[in-house]
From Swiss-Prot:
Task performed by this protein: Alpha-L-fucosidase is responsible for hydrolyzing the alpha-1,6-linked fucose joined to the reducing-end N-acetylglucosamine of the carbohydrate moieties of glycoproteins.
Positions of modified residues (Phosphoserine): 295
Key word Signal present: yes
Enzyme nomenclature, EC number: 3.2.1.51
Family: Belongs to the glycosyl hydrolase 29 family.
Signal peptide annotation: 1-25
Major localisation: secreted
GO cellular component: extracellular space
Lineage: Eukaryota, Metazoa, Chordata, Craniata, Vertebrata
Name of the protein in its database record: Plasma alpha-L-fucosidase
Gene3D superfamilies: Glycosidases, Golgi alpha-mannosidase II
Keywords: Glycoprotein, Glycosidase, Hydrolase, Phosphoprotein, Secreted, Signal
Enzyme superclass (EC): hydrolase
């Protein structure tokens, strides 16, 4: 017994024999108090703009929203019942849509190129929505995954490889904790979540598999199904994610880990869908929103007025970043794997705008004022290390003069330029504060961009 202990002693002492100058990595306990102390990896705040992709079996009926199955079978909303009666044979089940979910035209490289053109710095892809269909070959989702059925391809892997090989975007995954109609979840739910058969046999094994196999740098949890975080063992999983996982140094997480966690616990806050407070928050947050005003998934019945214009999208990006948030802008591909032209157009338009104005978005900080209280539709960001303030204005004044009520300029020190024009602009000081900028006389074709412009102000207070 003593000999065995002596042989084991060197192994026990190994953690103490670190080289000088090497510090032990921070370790987090499986409690919110400990987990919430983890610093958010810097890349996320610097990124500012990401793309959300909702794609699944729901993309085949492509009617109403990605909640099609629930609205049809559970709530039995008349428009969904009528849609099925008018378009599919009696007895057609939701599971039958998977045969039609071919992803025939899905080209991960093409998707990656479009994402790169958008100017986004990260992408979050739905690995599994509330319908339970996994977009990779999960052995916990037998005959209800993209490798066994439908596309018969590992969609997650194909997109991950394309994004990492062809773009500079960080790759992230969305995962729904619960599933609407999974019998084990329904059984646990009927016990008021005293039983934990579903998370133990389904949710947690899939989460560990996703992280180990695809190494996402964003893990976007959703869908607690009315269950508390301890039912999902969220703190235990996150402790492993932060301490031991292959992405422990770079991964960011959101706040949807069980009832009571949203807008309170997690890496960054989402608070609600399309959350956009319009003022500065003390915690990093994200505005996850949709180009289609009414759905995250593709809708075949959508009209042109249902889509946000590029002007509206630029405004959402600017006001979100000015208030310290990131914008996660959603698109919904079709069942055959194509990105609808209107989504591609919006993505490329955002990229065009960011090529000119990205300096005022990426790696910026909030300023002492988020927006101008005198002139509407003017939002501020800053780079204090360079003594720069950016004033992003969404309406070009007819007079050619833009009054900014917040900055205080100094004669001989303050300089003003228009991003994409790069000629010093004349400005005058106003009392008691503010400056008036003489904008350049430009024709439509000389404009550096079309949907919002940025003034770079140096040495203002």
């Amino acid at each position: 017994m003593r000999l065995g202990f002596l042989m084991l002693l060197p192994l026990l002492l190994l953690p103490l024999l670190r080289p000088w100058g090497v510090t032990r990595a921070l370790s987090y306990d499986p409690t919110w108090e400990s987990l919430d102390r983890r610093p958010l990896p810097a890349w996320f705040d610097q990124a500012k703009f990401g793309i959300f992709i909702h794609w699944g079996v729901f993309s085949v009926p492509s009617f109403g929203s990605e909640w099609f199955w629930w609205y049809w079978q559970k709530e039995k909303k008349p428009q969904f019942v009528d849609f099925m009666n008018n378009n599919y044979a009696p007895g057609f089940k939701y599971e039958d849509f998977v045969v039609l979910f071919t992803a025939k035209y899905f080209n991960a490289n093409q998707w990656a190129d479009i994402l790169q053109a958008s100017g986004a710095k990260y992408v979050v892809f739905t690995s599994k929505h509330h319908e339970g269909f996994t977009m990779w070959g999960s052995d916990r989702s037998w005959n209800w995954n993209a490798v066994d059925e439908g596309p018969k391809r590992d969609i997650v892997k194909e997109l991950e490889v394309a994004v990492r090989n062809r773009t500079g975007l960080h790759f992230g995954l969305y995962y729904s904790l619960f599933e609407w109609f999974h019998p084990l979840f329904l059984e646990d739910q009927s016990s008021s979540f005293q039983k934990q058969r579903f998370p133990v046999s389904k949710t947690l094994p899939e989460l560990y598999e996703l992280v180990n196999r695809y190494q996402p740098e964003v893990l976007w949890s959703d869908g607690d199904g009315g269950a508390p975080d301890h039912y999902w063992n969220s703190t235990g999983f996150l402790a492993w994610l932060y301490n031991e996982s292959p992405v422990r140094k770079t991964v960011v997480t959101n706040d949807r880990w069980g009832v009571g966690s949203i807008c309170k616990h997690g890496g960054y806050y989402t608070c609600s869908d399309r959350y956009n407070p319009g003022y500065l928050l003390p915690h990093k947050w994200e505005n996850c929103m949709t180009i289609d005003k009414f759905s995250w998934g593709y809708r075949r019945e959508a009209e042109i007025s249902d889509y946000l214009t590029i002007e509206e999208l630029v405004k959402k990006l600017v006001e979100t970043v000015a208030c310290g948030g990131n914008l996660l802008m959603n698109i919904g591909p079709t069942g055959d794997g194509t990105i609808p032209v209107i989504f591609e157009e919006r993505l490329r338009q955002m990229g065009t705008w960011l090529k000119v104005n990205g300096e005022a978005i990426y790696e910026t900080h909030t300023w002492r004022s988020q927006n101008d209280t005198v002139t509407p539709d003017v939002w501020y960001t800053s780079k204090p290390e360079k003594k720069l303030v950016y004033a992003i204005f969404l309406k070009w004044p007819i007079s050619g003069k833009l009054f900014l009520g917040q900055p205080i300029g100094s004669l001989g020190e303050t300089e003003v330029e228009l991003l994409g024009h790069w000629q010093p602009l004349t400005w005058t000081s106003s009392q008691p504060s503010g400056i008036t900028v003489e904008l350049p006389l430009l024709s439509v074709h000389q404009m550096p961009c079309k949907w919002g412009w940025t003034l770079v102000l140096s040495n203002v207070i």
